[in-house]
């Protein structure tokens, strides 16, 4: 059985995964049901699983071809082993995403569905309405990076946190901690450290400006 979680934590995850698929003005968002959000989140996860497995498959093929063509070259053997290792890592990531997709409906059923839907819609609506302001705030604190060059999931985790802090009166510490947890679940190995660093700079920035 999936563990019981706080409604707002589930809502953040639901909003994160649904952002790319749920668009529209406030009046349209009001008509979006919890099932619509859940379906959008599961579609996003399964699409990511498919993309990750395709990448892993390509790495396996490349590694196999190198082994087949250059069996006696030590450097090529090492390169092929690295490709296979990378493919295994990607496959594990895909399995984790698939597990998330499978357990997500049960997690929502165990929570207060009204609270989950209301906060997820509030987050999505706030980001849609204030996207320009949110992105400008993030661009101001991204050192040697451009927001658009970050992984899409990292962009959206950052937007969620900034939206909460600037517009939804969520305490900075709470929002940053929740963003870090989302990054641990959905970003790459170093993603959560990067997210934490950017958001710390953001909170310092707004205090001094």
From Swiss-Prot:
GO biological process, one term: transcription antitermination
Chain coiled-coil ranges: none
A cellular component annotation (GO) from this entry: cytosol
Database matches in CDD domains: Terminator_NusB
Keyword Ion transport among record annotations: no
Keywords on record: RNA-binding, Transcription, Transcription antitermination, Transcription regulation
GO MF annotations in UniProt: RNA binding
InterPro entries: NusB-like_sf, NusB_fam, NusB_RsmB_TIM44
Role: Involved in transcription antitermination. Required for transcription of ribosomal RNA (rRNA) genes. Binds specifically to the boxA antiterminator sequence of the ribosomal RNA (rrn) operons.
Family: Belongs to the NusB family.
HAMAP family: NusB
Designated name of the protein: Transcription antitermination protein NusB
Organism, scientific name: Crocosphaera subtropica (strain ATCC 51142 / BH68)
């Amino acid at each position: 059985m999936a563990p019981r979680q706080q409604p707002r934590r589930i809502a953040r995850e639901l909003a994160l995964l649904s952002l790319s698929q749920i668009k529209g003005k406030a009046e349209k968002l009001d008509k979006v049901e919890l099932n619509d959000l859940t379906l959008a989140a599961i579609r996003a996860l399964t699409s990511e699983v498919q993309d990750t497995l395709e990448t892993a498959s390509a790495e396996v093929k490349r590694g196999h071809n190198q082994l087949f063509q250059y069996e006696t070259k030590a450097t090529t053997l090492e390169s092929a082993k690295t490709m296979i290792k990378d493919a295994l890592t990607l496959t594990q990531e895909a399995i984790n995403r698939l597990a998330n997709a499978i357990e997500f409906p049960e997690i929502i059923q165990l929570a207060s569905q009204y609270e989950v839907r209301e906060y997820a819609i509030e987050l999505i609506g706030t980001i849609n309405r204030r996207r320009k302001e949110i992105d400008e705030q993030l661009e101001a604190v991204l050192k040697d990076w451009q927001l658009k060059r970050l992984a899409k999931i990292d962009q959206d985790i950052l937007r969620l946190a900034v939206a909460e802090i600037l517009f939804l009166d969520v305490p900075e510490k709470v929002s940053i901690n929740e963003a870090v947890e989302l990054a641990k679940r959905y970003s790459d190995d170093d993603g959560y450290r990067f997210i934490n660093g950017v958001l710390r700079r953001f909170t310092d920035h707004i205090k001094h400006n």
